Amino acid sequence: MAVRNVMKYSLGPVLYYWSKETLEDFYQQAAHSSADTIYLGEAVCSKRRATKVGDWLDMAKNLASGGKQVVLSTLALVQASSELNELKRYVDNGDFLIEASDLGVVNLCADRNLPFVAGHALNCYNAVTLRLLQKQGMMRWCMPVELSRDWLVNMLKQCEELGIRDKFEVEVLSYGHLPLAYSARCFTARSEDKPKDECETCCIKYPNGRDMLSQENQQVFVLNGIQTMSGYVYNLGNELKSMDALVDMVRLSPMGTNTFAMIDAFRANENGAAPLVLEAHSDCNGYWKRLAGLELQA
């Protein structure tokens, strides 16, 4: 297994519905952040139309001109031919790598002999599937969010046996509310007693998703359109040493402009010299430790 030399950090796509102006301001600041790679694009719902394909491409060009590697993220749940046609515009952009979160996008990239990033929403749980994706053009794989370090170690051993371990990078989503499930239903609209077809894109009122509490007042989930997300914030900032020789890129999911400072905090603690202060019932790292997802273990 190849040992990494330098850990790279990525800023994942904004998963929430923000206004075009908010996004433009966010990515102007992202251009000056310490992120090596920046993902952007609508990854949740095609009804979020405030920012058009051309707008995303303009922001991508601005980021690339500043030296960032830019990746265009795409929908995790493609439900209509019209959505597929719009995704073709992303795939055919001519400049930027694509993050495929649906096998339809994998096929679009493969048909054009284009490399792609396999997103964490793809159901990829064994080395044979990784080999198939790699043959189709995968150059980076972001592992599913619910899987552990032990599982990753075993997976990469299988990849070594298949002779593909050195043919792609490994990325792990390490900060943010985790997307746990996707549905054709819109839970944010339902929480406001609106049908999905008449949702009025009410998700824009919840810039970090809508909290969902248990009867014991525990924040168990966050609703974000068709996504159900973890209630606690996943934070692997103190687990970076355990990623050595396994992970090439650490992804942080945007939760506002304070995410830029969090990237710096991760970098500062890469060797364990500046541990992050994590709080029970707010932060979690259970999945990485092969525990219940909402657990926090030192």
What are these regions (language model features)?
Residues 2-124, 128, 132, 142-298:
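Active-site pocket-lining/capping segments in soluble small-molecule metabolic enzymes
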Residues 135:
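Active-site neighborhood of glycoside hydrolase catalytic domains
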